[in-house]
């Protein structure tokens, strides 16, 4: 079996530790592939797509830690984050006070220990369209509870 080098970090990768991209380049599963979202399709992506996605996640994670995490803890209801439901493997949050939306993926090293958060942050202006569904159900006390499910469609441009 031929060994290849990772196109991003230069590490030598073998058959079980490589991920082949659409343009024929290889990336390592141990380091570089873990820097992307799990829902990101690496098989159909090129090297440029993967590096742009990794840069976007690094920048989005910094913005998440600097702006969104303090807003999660605020007591002001107008600045509080709103969660977007309906996304499969990522959690979405909208910050009405800043005009930003974030999609995060939480990863754990073991069970609930060693949590790391990866985030992609977009402007609300990048939202092209969305579909929402309102579901009404009754809880255990007999009160009506409404759950809003939102499916956003974004114009994926990097945040500047």
Whereabouts are the PLM-identified features?
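A general secondary-structure signal for short beta-strands and their flanking turns/coil
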Residues: 1, 117, 147-151
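Hydrophobic beta-strand residues in large extracellular and virion-surface proteins
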Residues: 28, 101, 152-156
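Secondary-structure transition/turn motif
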Residues: 30-33, 104-108, 159
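Short coil-to-beta-strand transition motifs
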Residues: 116-128
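Surface loops and adjacent helix of pleckstrin homology
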Residues: 18, 104-106, 132-135
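Acidic, Ser/Thr- and proline-rich intrinsically disordered linker/docking segments
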Residues: 128-160
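N-terminal cysteine/histidine-rich coordination modules
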Residues: 1-61
């Amino acid at each position: 079996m031929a060994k290849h080098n990772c196109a991003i970090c230069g590490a030598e990768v073998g058959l079980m530790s490589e991920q082949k991209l659409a343009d024929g380049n290889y990336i390592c599963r141990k380091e570089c592939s873990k820097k992307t979202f799990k829902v990101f399709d690496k098989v159909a992506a090129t090297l440029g797509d993967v590096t742009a996605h990794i840069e976007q996640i690094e920048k989005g994670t910094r913005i998440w830690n600097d702006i969104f995490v303090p807003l999660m803890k605020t007591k002001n209801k107008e600045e509080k984050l709103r969660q977007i439901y309906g996304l499969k493997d990522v959690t979405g949050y909208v910050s009405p006070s800043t005009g930003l939306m974030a999609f995060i993926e939480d990863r754990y090293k073991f069970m609930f220990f060693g949590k790391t958060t990866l985030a992609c942050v977009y402007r609300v202006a990048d939202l092209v369209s969305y579909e929402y569904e309102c579901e009404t159900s009754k809880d255990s006390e007999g009160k009506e509870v409404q759950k809003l499910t939102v499916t956003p469609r974004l114009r994926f441009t990097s945040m500047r």
